[in-house]
Structure formats: C-alpha cells, structure tokens
Amino acid sequence: MNNNQCMRKKLDELRNIARSYNISITGKKKQQLCDEIIDYQKNNPPRRSPSPRRSPSPRRISPECEQWLANKGINPRTGKAIKIGGPTYKKLEMECKEASPKIPSPVRQPSPVHSPVRSPVRQPSPVRFVEKTKGALNKMKKDQLIDFAQSLGLNPGKLLKPALVDLIFVNQKPPRRSPSPRRSPSPRRSPSPRRSPSPRPVFVEKTKGALNKMKKDQLIDLAQSLGLNPGKLLKPALVDLIFVNQKPVEPIRASSSSRSSRSTRRSSSTKPSRRSSSRSRRSSSRSRRSSSRSRRSSSRSRRSSRRSTSRSRSLSKRSIRNISTVGDLEDLVASNLPIAIPESLSRSLSPSRTDFHEAEIELGSDFDLNNLPENRIAELKQLNVLAKQNGFRMINVPLDGNCMFSVIGRAFNTSSSVIRQHTVDYLRRCKGSFDHIPANIDDPTINWNDYIDRLEEDACWGDNTALFAASLALNFQAHILQVAGGDEGSWIRFGVNETNMGRIVNMGYLDNFHYIALEPFSGRLDILSIPSTHSKCPPPEISNRRDEEIRRDEEVEDEVIGERIVREAEVIERELRQEEELTSIVSTKRSLRPSIPPKISTEHRRTPKLRPSVPRPSSIRQSQPNVAALARLETLTKIKDIIDALQRPLENKLSTLTNTEKAIMQCIGVA
C-alpha cells in the first residue's frame, strides 16, 4: 500500500487496519496512521506458506503493472491520477500486455481416487440470466461493462461508458443454449380433453391520457399488434392513430363464399328433386328480400336515432359555423363535435359512391397513400369529393407536425415557423382573453404558460385555439372543410369580421390527423400580406359561461320582469275600480233629489193605472265628473315610464314586450 492508496481510504478503515497491526490510534490523524501502517508493512511483510498441492506460479508481471491493474486510475510511477483512455493509460496498457502475455490455465482432470461406479463430477449449474436496469448498468465499471457486452455477443469497440450502457440495455438478451446431449427432449404431450384452452385476454381500450403516458416504442408495438402501420409518425400522430383505430384483431373466419360452396356440396351430395330445389330457391329469395328490408329499416332507424340523439344537430341546423369571438371558440372547444349539414348535401354523399380514383386526388410526392390506414384513405377520398363539390382542389403539405401553419404560410408566401411565431406572440400578449378556456381538455393540469411554450416548439400540432389566435393575429378568415361523422361534411369559419372579408384561407381537415390546402379551380387566390401593426386583443370580460346558461338566465330575468309588471298593473286596476265605485256613489246620491216636488193631499184617492208622463226620479242621471278618465291618463303615464325604464333590458325580447303591453291594456280596460 502506498501513500495515495492509504489516503483514499476512510479513517475508520485505517483505524481497523492499525488495530490489526497492534498500532495505537489515540490522538492520531489520518496522515500519521498512514505513515505508521506503511512502515509496519515494509518492516513486516506478510508470510505466506507455500501450498503443498500447488507449486507457486511463476511471476508474470512487474510490480508496477500489478499496482496499475489494481487501480487503473493512478500512475504507479508517479502516484498521480490519470485519465482513463488517455495517452498515459494506453501506454501503460501496452507495456503490461507486452510484459505479461496471458497464458491459459490448464484444465484440471478429475481425481483418480473416485471409483468408476460413482457418477462423474457435476458441472456447476449455469447462473440464471437477469436483465439489468439502466441504473444498475451505470453503477458498473467500464471493464465490467465490456466483459458483460462480450458475454452477450456484442462488440464494445472503443465506445464510451454512456454509449456502452445504452448498447447493453437495448440488446441484453439471454444467450441461446444448445440442448443438453445427455437428456433427450421429452415428447410433446397431447392436449388433455378435460381442460379447455384458456380464453384469450380481454381487449381493453385505452384512453388518450394513458396513450400519452406510454413511450414511443410501446406505442409502436401496440400499433403493430392492432394491425396498423406506424411508419415514421411522431408520437402525437401515433397516439391519435391508435386512439381512433384501437379495436381487437378478429380471427379470420370462413367467408360466405366458402360457406356457400360447402352448402352446395352438401346439396349436390343429397341430390334433391327439381320441385324441392325450386321451392328452396323461392324461400331463399323471400328470405333475402325480408333480410334486405330489415336491413333497410334498421339503417333508417339508426339514421333517425343518430339524427335525434346527436348533439351536433342540436348545436346548429346549418352547414356553416362562424367562430368570431372568444365565446364561440369556448363553445367549439367544449363541444368538440362536428357540425351537421343539410340533408340535401348528405344525400349526395351516399356511402355507395365509389366512382373516384386515386389520380383525382392531387397530392404531393411525400403523401403516400400506402402508408395510411384504410379509414384515413376513405376519409381523404371523401374530403376530395366534398372539395370538388365546393369548387376546390386539394394541395398537400408535408406531414411534419406543422401542417396547419404550412397551409396558412402558403397563403402568406412565408414559412410555417413565421406563422407559428406570430401566433405564439399573439397568445402571450392576449393571454388574459383566453384564461377561462382550458388549455388542454385531455390534461387539465396543463396551464396556459405550458401550452404556449409547447406550441412554440417545432412539429407541435395546432388546435382550434391556435387557429383562432392566428386568424386574429394576421387578420384573415380561416374557412375549414371537414368530413364529420363518416359521409357528412361541414364548414367552420374562424376570425370572421368586417375588416377581413377579402382575406380568406381555405383548408381541408382530416379529423385529428392532417390539414390540406384548398385552391379554387378558377385560379389561385392573391397572396396575403402580414399586417405591420399588432392586432387588438379580444375583450377579457367575456364570461366563461355557455350560451345555454346565459339564455336560461335571460329567460328567468324576463319572467321576473313580466311578473312584476303584471303585479303593478293589478294594483293600478284595483285603484281604478275603487275610484270608479266612489264616483258612482257620489253621482247616485246627487241623483236622488226629485226634479218635481210632490203634492200632499188629505183625500184618499185611488191612483189611476195610467203611465205617468214624467219619468221616475231614480232614472234621471246628471252628468258625472270625468274623474276616471283623469285617473286613466295618470296610470298610462306611469306605465309609459315603467316601459321606458325597462326598454333597454328588453330590446331583444320584442315578443315578451308586446305580450306584457297587451296584458297591461287588458287590465286597464283600454283594449
């Protein structure tokens, strides 16, 4: 042991060594203990008795090489640390190899003492192979890693330690063993008739969050197990591909043609008569007709149920949806459903239409239809039919995660990175207007700062919020044609206002997959210019409530206002009735006075049965004062003041206002 090796050890280890050498350790520091231990080892070298069974092996290497092999990080000549893999390290390695070539040790023969009756010496059982984690590999030294790589049949070469760890971690598999010659393989047993084969594992569909947590290698294996071709897709595109198409691969069953051939063989073997064959044909044709009718009725019921239960029908009855405010964007993000189209357009897009070809789709060379799944190819062809019906042809952009920004940049004659930067700058400047909208529906823990930072990265997909922000930042309208619900299409327009009526960017959209540029057949549109000034932010005071809740609150407010008006009208009606009763009482009291004074006669005469010429005093009415008319005028002015005060909250509710006016007039008695 030299001084450097001694100083590298801990104080407790040195104290234990000193105790074994009977050296006192009280009050001594590390350097003093090292000096005494080294002196003791020099003066008292360890005595080793030669083994009687083995002759001492000749010394192969020099003491310097022994010290260097014991610790390859220290130069034995100078005692200083050296760099592993450096020039001094390589020089020492070459010297020690030349000075001491490796001599293979002779193989021991079994002892002749054993009798031939006994079984031969057993070889040690092979160590069970255990895959090591990356942390365990990092803790190993480089020499151990090199030996481990060679045992796995790998060529480490001159790789550094991190690359060597990755090489072993990826390729660590147990070596194949040849079958033992002593034991013949046992014959395969026939399956037991009592035990049925174990059922197949139940397929469980995974959510989008669970797919996002998986690694890309796991996603590729899952896609291949589902019969999909992942290709060179990025992780977001791979997640969407698996989420849309995750269905268990069904086993191949006998086709209808094979079944029919079997049935024909059976029928030919039985040889029925002509009458029975004609009857069977008639019954089969009838069954086919009934089955076709049942299929039609079931398809009609499915269509009707879809139309009645689908939320997209309740959202809008039109084929165009405008996204011009933050509230519209909030509804679009919350609904996350396609917009329905008129039935006339859906009839023209019947699924039986197959008269289009791949040559009609004008796509770039990078868009290979063979690498796409079948449902995406069908959706792409359907989008091509929709585009042609609307007077557009499809122009593809690269599938690199920047497709939305590339389509917009094509209209502005610039790159996708410029459009992305304008969008990110606008979102950072106007972040307060979008705070109430969730940044990510699948992962609510992501806040707006993380969302904007991710959106700034290259190959990050753009969503509805990014498209809305880009339309406001660059002052253009984004008209998007998409295939919604199989064979139905719809238009969605982002950023519609009066200032950008001529600045339109048309694009097609494959759901959760790709954006495609649309150009009219008449000619290419003019190239748009990027505005020099910053666009204004949307108003931040827009509430985060849905339109249905706002409409419900307005209806409740209208009902409360109408009830209050009816109560006030009833109070006014009661006052008018009381005033009319008072005026009628006053008028009747004044009319009790007779116009002709009666004559008093002492003689009792029988009254004649003639009708008097003078009318009765009770039937004579004097002219009443016009108090009720004045009261009506006062109440009408009061009602007019009430209507003027309530006119602003009821501007958009003309029907409610007219109904309340009619009720007021009926209560007053004017109508």
Swiss-Prot record:
Lineage top rank: taxon: Viruses
Region span, Disordered: 36-62, 100-123, 171-203, 250-319, 589-625
Biological-process GO terms, alphabetical: DNA-templated transcription termination; protein deubiquitination; proteolysis
Gene3D superfamilies xrefs: 3.90.70.80
UniProt entry keywords in alphabetical sequence: Hydrolase, Protease, Thiol protease, Ubl conjugation pathway
Compositional bias annotation for Low complexity: 110-123, 255-271
The protein's role, per its UniProt record: Hydrolase that can remove conjugated ubiquitin from proteins and may therefore play an important regulatory role at the level of protein turnover by preventing degradation.
EC number assigned by the record: 3.4.19.12
Location of the active site: 400, 403, 514
Skewed-composition ranges (Pro residues): 182-200
Composition bias, Basic residues: 272-319
Family annotation (PANTHER family): OTU DOMAIN CONTAINING PROTEIN
Domain OTU: from-to ranges: 392-521
UniProt keyword Hydrolase present: yes
Coiled coil regions in record: none
CDD domains in UniProt: OTU_232R-like
Annotated catalysed reactions: Thiol-dependent hydrolysis of ester, thioester, amide, peptide and isopeptide bonds formed by the C-terminal Gly of ubiquitin (a 76-residue protein attached to proteins as an intracellular targeting signal)
Pfam families: 2C_adapt, OTU
Protein name, entry field: Putative ubiquitin thioesterase 232R
Root EC class: hydrolase
GO molecular function: cysteine-type deubiquitinase activity
Protein's UniProt keywords contain DNA damage: no
